[in-house]
Amino acid sequence: MNKIYSIKYSAATGGLIAVSELAKKVTCKTNRKISAALLSLAVISYTNIIYAANMDISKAWARDYLDLAQNKGVFQPGSTHVKIKLKDGTDFSFPALPVPDFSSATANGAATSIGGAYAVTVAHNAKNKSSANYQTYGSTQYTQINRMTTGNDFSIQRLNKYVVETRGADTSFNYNENNQNIIDRYGVDVGNGKKEIIGFRVGSGNTTFSGIKTSQTYQADLLSASLFHITNLRANTVGGNKVEYENDSYFTNLTTNGDSGSGVYVFDNKEDKWVLLGTTHGIIGNGKTQKTYVTPFDSKTTNELKQLFIQNVNIDNNTATIGGGKITIGNTTQDIEKNKNDQNKDLVFSGGGKISLKENLDLGYGGFIFDKNKKYTVSAEGNNNVTFKGAGIDIGKGSTVDWNIKYASNDALHKIGEGSLNVI
């Protein structure tokens, strides 16, 4: 009997595949078990690149920008009172905050996982499909299959599978508070009774260095980190309000072309955790100093897309029989629904009980979601040798799912959630 936490099963290899070591928040429980001058940052030809500088290595070492983004060295998630040696031998102290976990950033930095099969980026990344339509977490590539965008350059994406390599960034930042409340909740004491909101960004973009002569290169999987302080919570720019920030003067990593969509994080003092403020939209600057603009996370649009992929199924400790495109519980039968794009939805089970498959079930981009603190059994009706294929399985905290179904030969079972999956 297998107990799986966040892992995937490959029918091709006939075994469990461990998630990447980059997945800092994932554990496994198994025995086998602004103006016209505002520039969006989509990748363009090198002849049109505005900013030749990225990492300022006149004071800090290049490795520190890279190590922070990849949570290596002294930058382990949760580490506090972190210091680095500058080139002149003096110490640079980072803010008195725990180091963020950046595993929610896709390998090229252009999008951020927010859990399940969802990720966020900026809408204008659609012009460059390689930047956000295909996302790699750990060693697994995911594909965008649906999205919603806003006029404020926000984009929420549905991916083809549940992302197992990370739990995703927390999206509880409350942009609807007034400015003072936001500063009080997310600010850091910088002395003289003053608070500033300090945060981090992780992206790729055109990698260059100030202080030395190098050619420019766009290396999509070369992630580096920025340290910044917010200067304007409601900068009125093209499309709507953006958050404006400036880079730290010592640990300076300017935003460049290719950084569009990269995640921006601030610390929630009330909940004692890092949260996603939004995604990188654009820049204004002269090559030495710059202001970066961030599109705030849009919970309303995110929930609208999620609703397109939800079909609620209340079993209530009974048996749900699935076959012929229908779900039958007692004397009640409902169709397995699809959204307006003819895509299968997630079947969201509640109440505990048994799920019996009469035939092979291919949910396409939909998966199984189980509520908290319940017991479920998934098996074939009779002795049928049936298979399951879909986006994955999401098991709520405190729930246990006994799974006695084979996997389709061309699929991998992605399991997420804090509950237990027992593969029989």
Spans of model-derived segments:
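Catalytic histidine site
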Residues: T80, K85-S139
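Chymotrypsin/trypsin-fold serine protease catalytic domain
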Residues: F154-G258
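Extracellular, surface-exposed repeat architectures
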Residues: G351-I424
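Bacterial Sec-dependent N-terminal signal peptides
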Residues: M1-L38, Y46-Y51
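Acidic glycine-/aspartate-rich tracts in secreted/extracellular proteins
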Residues: A23-K24, H124-K127, N160-E165, S204-T208, ...
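Conserved catalytic-core segment of clan PA serine endopeptidases
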Residues: D56-Y65, V120, K127-G191
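C-terminal subregion of chymotrypsin/trypsin-like serine protease catalytic domains
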Residues: A53-I84, A111, G115, A119, ...
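Acidic Gly/Asp/Thr-rich repetitive segments characteristic of extracellular carbohydrate-active
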Residues: N317-V348
